[in-house]
Amino acid sequence: MTDVPVRIVTAPAVVRDRATWLAYFHIGLFGYFLYAFGPSIALLRDERGYTRTVASLHGSAMALGAVVVGFLAVHVVRRTGRGPFLRMGSVTLAAGLLLYTGFSSLWVTLLGAFVASGGGTMIMVGVNAFLPDHHGPAGPRAMSEAHGLGATMGLLGPLAVGLGVAIGWGWRVGLLATIVGLVVLEIARGRNTEQFDGPHGHPDDEPGHAPHGPLPRRFWLAMAVFGVCAGTEFCLTLWGSDLLRDRAGLGASAAAASLVTLVGGMAVGRVAGAPLVSRFDPDHVLAATMGLTVVGFTIAWLSAAPGPMLVGFAVIGLGLGLQSPLAIGRAVIAAEGQADRGAGLTSVAAGLASGIAPFVLAAVADHLGVHTAFLIVPALMVAGILLVRAAPVPVTDAVGDAVPTDAVPD
C-alpha cells in the first residue's frame, strides 16, 4: 500500500494595516458586548423578579435582530457601501445598549436587546466580508486573528459585569463600557470609510457573488451544523452563570465573573487549535471539538463544587473555540459560488439557534430545574457530529479548486 503524503502549505502572511486593526478591534468590541450580555440576563432577572422563561426572551430578541440583519445586510451594503454600513453597526449597537440599560420596562429592554443585536450583527457581517476582500489569500488567517481577538476581549466582559456588581456599581456599567470603545473606534476610523469597501463593498460595484439561485443541499446541512454550534454557545453564555449559582452555590457577581473560564477556554481553543486545522481534515477537527465539549460538559454537569465545575467550563470552552470559525467556513465553502449570500445566511442561522436553544433551556429549567435543562448541550453536540458525518464539506476555494487545509478559518 502506498502512503498518501499530507500536503501542508503555509498560507500568505497577513499585512496588518490600519484598516485591518480597526476591523479587529470592531470584532473585539462585539465579543466584549456579547459575553458581557449573557450574565447580565440572569442579573436582570434577579432585579426584576422575572422567571427564566421571561428573562430568556431577551436572548430571543437578540436572535430576531440577527435574523433580520442577516436577511437585509447584503441589500443595505449594496446601497451604502461597507464602510458606512460598519459605522451604522456601531451606532445601532450603542443605541441598543442605551435602551437595554437605561429603562426598566420589559418591552423596552427587549427592544434594546433586539437593536443591540442588530448592530452587532452588522459589525460581524461587515468585518467578515471586509477581511477576505481586503486580504485575499491571507483572508482566512485574518479572520482567525479577528475572531481570536473577539474571544480574548470577550474575557473582559463577564469580569467587568461581575466587578461592577461586587463594588456596588451594578451590572450596567460593564455593558456601557462597550459604547466608550465604539466611540473611540469611530473617531479613529475618521470620515473616510472607503478603505473598508474593497472591490466588492462599494455601492457602485456589482456584488462579488450572485445573490440569487438555489443553494446546494450540502449548504443547508452545513448551516444546520453552524446553528447547532451557535445554539450550544448561547446556551452556555446566557445561562452558564445560572448553572454555577444553582449547583456550585456561587453568588451573583462570582457566577457572572466565573464565565471567564468558558470564554478563556474558547480563546485558547482558537489559538491552540490552528495547527490541528493545518494538519487534519477540518471536518474531523470540528467533530472532535464537539466531542471535547461533551467531555467538558460531563465534568461540569456531574460536579457540585466550584473547582470541578470551572474546570469543566474551561474544557467546554476549548471545544467551542474552533467550532464557529470552522462551521462558518464550511458553510461558505458549501455555498459554491454564492459566498456572500452564504455568509449572510449564517447570521440567520446564528440568530435562529441563539433564540430557540436558550429559550427551550430556560422553559425546561422553570419546570425541571436548570441542571436537567442543560442536557440540551450534549444533545446538540451529538446532533452536530451526526450532521458533519452525514454531509462532509471538502476544503475548496471560491472557484472549487483544492486549497491548503491551513487556509480554512481557524
Residue ranges of predicted features:
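Conserved MFS/SLC helix-loop-helix module at the cytosolic interface between two early adjacent transmembrane helices
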Residues: 68-107
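Helix-breaking motifs and short loop linkers at transmembrane-helix boundaries and internal kinks
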Residues: 49, 81, 102-107, 136, ...
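Structural signature of the two symmetry-related core transmembrane helices
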Residues: 84-98, 284-299
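Helix-loop-helix hairpin linking two adjacent transmembrane segments in secondary transporters
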Residues: 137-138, 145-197
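A late C-terminal transmembrane helix in Major Facilitator Superfamily
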Residues: 337-370, 377
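Helix-to-loop junctions at the C-terminal end of transmembrane segments
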Residues: 69-82, 269-282, 365-366
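Extracytoplasmic gate region of multi-pass secondary transporters
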Residues: 37-38, 216-268
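Cytoplasmic helix-loop-helix junction between adjacent transmembrane helices
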Residues: 112-150
